[in-house]
Amino acid sequence: MNKNVITVYINNNQSIEEFSWLYKTWRMWDISKTWDIIAFTDPCAIEAITKSYSNIDCLKIIELEATQSCSSITIFESEENVKLLLGYDFIYKTSCDTFLTKEFSAFKPWKDKIYVGIGLHANQGAVGGLIREKEELLNKALELKWHGHTHIGGGLIGHSSIVFKITKMQYTINNWLLKFSFTEGVGVFPNWNTDSAIDYAFEMAINHIASPLSLHIGSLDSWCSSNELTSLDLSIKAWPNNEILFNKKKWFAGELPSIGFSKLPITAGEYCLMIADSNVDQLVNMAIRELN
């Protein structure tokens, strides 16, 4: 058991394949030596996951109860899950469609820092309906702090005590939003909408808990496009649209080419395509060549 853990939630066939991207990069860069993975898995996906990932050191598969109403944040509401996670110093809460980079293998988080990714849910909607304006007003109405943090993505790294605090507040705010803030209908992105409520809740919780000095934005959930990877990029998010080199909708539709990279790509999009299209052994060998 390592001192740190990456947590993900697996709930369908697509997330099973997406999990392979996270898993392959975890193995490729020997991140398994410093970070465990715990995959909280719905019963509908447990057979496929255990078939592919059983008896792997530092990887735990936790089957969730069939009656449990699950999401990426409700798993932190279970006493059993909390007890399991309390054994770790740091937690990286992320989604399956995450690609870890070489830089993550040497990353050592600070105890007093909260690391978050970049999100798109705060894009401007209709005139007078800016998402961040509504979030700020709601925080003030709920007597929560607002530090002006915006475009916060779903990725979160922090000391376990901080992660529990943030996810608990996110869970509470999300339930409140769904109950009281959509009286005019469910809405459609990029305007105020129920599908993004969990993202609004996360940004609102971060604004209340994280001061400007404690928050580090941008090293997680980097763009998956033609941008060159830098030493600051710890992970890449597989965005579902508008990406030049790796669009995950096109990947699942079989519309992306199989290139067969002979060396490590320098752009994030090519890196993601290489990971998705290669097996673990190929990637480990490439990492060995890169590091030597």
Predicted regions span which residues?
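A structural signal for short, well-ordered beta-strand segments and their strand-loop junctions
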Residues: I38-A39, I91-S95, Y115-G117, L213-G218
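Catalytic core and acceptor-binding pocket of nucleotide-sugar-dependent glycosyltransferases
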Residues: L144-P240
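C-terminal catalytic/acceptor-binding lobe
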Residues: F189-T194, H208-N292
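Short catalytic/ligand-binding loop motif for oxyanion handling, primarily in non-cytosolic enzymes
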Residues: Q14-S15, I46-I49, F99-E103, Q124-G125, ...
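A conserved donor-nucleotide-binding helix/loop in the catalytic core
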Residues: I62-T94, T98-K102, A106, K113, ...
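Conserved donor-nucleotide/metal-binding helix-loop-beta segment in metal-dependent transferases, i.e.
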Residues: T98-L142
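A structure-centric feature marking long, well-folded core domains of fungal metabolic enzymes
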Residues: I75-S78, K102, V127-G129, N174-L177
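N-terminal anchoring/stem segment of glycosyltransferases
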Residues: M1-C70, E80-Y88
